[in-house]
C-alpha cells in the first residue's frame, strides 16, 4: 500500500472538511459561535484553524465547565506524532476564554499571568478532550483553569489564566474593529 490513505478514503476525508460545523457535541448542544467568527482557535469556518467547539455542562463534582473535543492532525506536530506545544496552548487558552465568556456571563479579556504546563503532549490522530472552569470569580476579575486529557483520561496539560471584563472604550481607543456580536457583550 502506498503512502497515505487509499484514494477513496482521502476523498471521504476531504468531504468531511466541507460539512457544516457540528451543532451537537457528545449529545449536548454547542455553545453559540457565529460562522463569521475569524478566530484561529474557534472560528467555525476558519480555513486553517482548529475550529474548536464547546458545550456547557456540569462536571461530576457539580462544578459548571465548558468541554470540547479535538483530534490533532498530522500537520499540527512539533515532535513527530506529538501535537505542537503552541497549538496545545491554543486549545487550552480557547477553552479558558469560553469558560470566562460562558460562565462569567460577559465578554472578558486575558490579563496575565498565564501558567501553562504539559505533562504529555496530545498524540496525533487520537481523540482528546479539553475542559475549563472558573476557579475564582469576582465582578472585575476571573481565574480559569483548563485541562486536556487523552484517551483513558490521562492528563496532557493545564493552563491557568486571569481575565478582566472587556471594555468597548479600550477597544475603540486601540482602533480594533469589532463585530457587533462582540461589542454587544462588552462593558462600556
Q: Where are the predicted features?
A:
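HotDog/MaoC-like acyl-thioester-processing domains
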Residues: 6-32, 122-124, 135-188
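Catalytic strand-loop segment that frames the active site of acyl-thioester-processing enzymes
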Residues: 33-83
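Intrinsic-disorder/low-complexity, polar/charged segments enriched in Ser/Thr/Lys/Arg/Asp/Glu/Gln
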Residues: 62-67, 113, 127-129, 141-143, ...
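A short beta-loop-beta micro-motif enriched in histidine and acidic residues
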Residues: 82-87, 105
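Hydrophobic beta-strand-centered segment that forms part of the acyl-chain substrate-binding groove
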Residues: 95-135
Amino acid at each position: 500500500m502506498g503512502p497515505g490513505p487509499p484514494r477513496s478514503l482521502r476523498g471521504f476525508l476531504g468531504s468531511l472538511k466541507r460539512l457544516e460545523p457540528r451543532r451537537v457535541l457528545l449529545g449536548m448542544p454547542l455553545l453559540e459561535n457565529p460562522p463569521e467568527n475569524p478566530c484561529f482557535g474557534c472560528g467555525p469556518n476558519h480555513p486553517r484553524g482548529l475550529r474548536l467547539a464547546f458545550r456547557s455542562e456540569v462536571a461530576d463534582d457539580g462544578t459548571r465547565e465548558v468541554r470540547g473535543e479535538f483530534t490533532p492532525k498530522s500537520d499540527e506536530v512539533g515532535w513527530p506524532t506529538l501535537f505542537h506545544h503552541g497549538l496545545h496552548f491554543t486549545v487550552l487558552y480557547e477553552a479558558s476564554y469560553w469558560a470566562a465568556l460562558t460562565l462569567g456571563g460577559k465578554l472578558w479579556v486575558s490579563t496575565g499571568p498565564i501558567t501553562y504546563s504539559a505533562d504529555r503532549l496530545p498524540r496525533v490522530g487520537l481523540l482528546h478532550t479539553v475542559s475549563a472552569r472558573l476557579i475564582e470569580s469576582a465582578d472585575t476579575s476571573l481565574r480559569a483553569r483548563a485541562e486536556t486529557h487523552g484517551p483513558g483520561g490521562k492528563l496532557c496539560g493545564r493552563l491557568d489564566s486571569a481575565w478582566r471584563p472587556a471594555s468597548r472604550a479600550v477597544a475603540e481607543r486601540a482602533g480594533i474593529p469589532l463585530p457587533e456580536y462582540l461589542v454587544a457583550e462588552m462593558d462600556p
